[in-house]
């Protein structure tokens, strides 16, 4: 999974902070749906990788019951944890027993 996340992270658009994030949601059928962060100059209207992955999953016809686990990787040495808005989305759209895996840029997972 870490290698997939590193490949996906290359697509992030982080021209302001240069902090890239990749997210992969694994579905019950083991299909992977991806997302990356997209920054905007105003700093407010960008999108987190988790938000993009969730939107992509719904766009592809999946529903909340299809979500199996979520993986998030950031481009720094620190473990990338979902922000407060993404935690709210995870709480709303994912079942309580959904596994959340958070990685740093070296693939260390928590």
Regions found by a protein language model. Name each.
Residues 1-110:
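Zinc-dependent deaminase catalytic domain
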């Amino acid at each position: 999974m870490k290698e997939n996340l590193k490949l996906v992270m290359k697509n992030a658009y982080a021209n302001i902070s240069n902090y890239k994030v990749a997210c992969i949601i694994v579905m019950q059928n083991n299909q992977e749906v991806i997302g990356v962060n997209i920054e905007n100059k105003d700093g407010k209207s960008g999108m987190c990788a988790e938000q993009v992955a969730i939107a992509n999953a719904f766009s592809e016809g999946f529903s909340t019951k299809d979500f199996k686990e979520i993986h998030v990787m950031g481009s720094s040495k620190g473990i990338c944890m979902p922000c407060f808005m993404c935690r709210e989305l995870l709480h709303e759209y994912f079942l309580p027993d959904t596994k959340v895996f958070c990685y740093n840029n070296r693939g260390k997972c928590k």
